[in-house]
Amino acid sequence: MKWDEIGKNIAKEIEKEILPYFGRKDKSYVVGTSPSGDETEIFDKISEDIALKYLKSLNVNIVSEELGVIDNSSEWTVVIDPIDGSFNFINGIPFFAFCFGVFKNNEPYYGLTYEFLTKSFYEAYKGKGAYLNGRKIKVKDFNPNNIVISYYPSKKIDLEKLRNKVKRVRIFGAFGLEMCYVAKGTLDAVFDVRPKVRAVDIASSYIICKEAGALITDENGDELKFDLNATDRLNIIVANSKEMLDIILDLL
């Protein structure tokens, strides 16, 4: 199967159908609750239905933020977040994406994260590098004098101490897409140790970051392990280097 073609076709159809809802609270409404307890807005449901239209005929396992798990006993599992950054989307904040991760026998195989408003396709096949619209990308070199990170506040970390270690702290509100910003060298790191992140948030960008040279660990600095479901919450650190990772771990 040509997973890149499938993912891009889904992304472009979702884009066509949901962008009229961007920033339009008056047009959106809640249609249900996801397996993890989050409210499902109509644009989430529209996006998921489009993805399912493509995927169900393939008879693969499916994990989706809104639906949960469809187990077809396949060697292939597709993990999707129809809209990464739903809060941003409905509030008119231009930072949200479609996430499409493919696993073979539970191992990362292909990842696609599509940033709608910049029309940016981040993607990677295992062992073949990471790309942004066909251009190869990699994490930037560590520079202690110019560290820019995205961080989700936690009582585990002293924010003032963190600010003394880095030049800029940002919170963008779409973790999977933020991971891609590490992969392309815009951010040095993104991390969340509350824990709040789920597999659906990171499945597509995980392989993109790994192929771009990023380190992805848990709060102890061990390589991140996660199950392919829509409910488990994770602590995750994504860093461009061992030096950056050590700075974050020293704060925990």
Curated annotation (Swiss-Prot):
Coiled coil: none annotated. SUPFAM superfamilies: Carbohydrate phosphatase. The keyword Magnesium applies. Mg(2+) 1 binds at E65, D81, I83. Substrate binds at D84, G85, S86, R170, F175, R194. Homodimer. Is thermostable. After incubation at 85 degrees Celsius for 30 minutes, more than 95% of I-1-Pase activity remains. IMPase activity is inhibited by Ca(2+) and Zn(2+). In contrast to mammalian I-1-P phosphatases, is not inhibited by Li(+) up to 100 mM. This is Fructose-1,6-bisphosphatase/inositol-1-monophosphatase. Belongs to the inositol monophosphatase superfamily. FBPase class 4 family. Keywords: Carbohydrate metabolism, Hydrolase, Magnesium, Metal-binding. It comes from Methanocaldococcus jannaschii (strain ATCC 43067 / DSM 2661 / JAL-1 / JCM 10045 / NBRC 100440). It holds the Pfam family Inositol_P. InterPro entries: Inositol_monoP_metal-BS, Inositol_monophosphatase-like, Inositol_monophosphatase_CS.
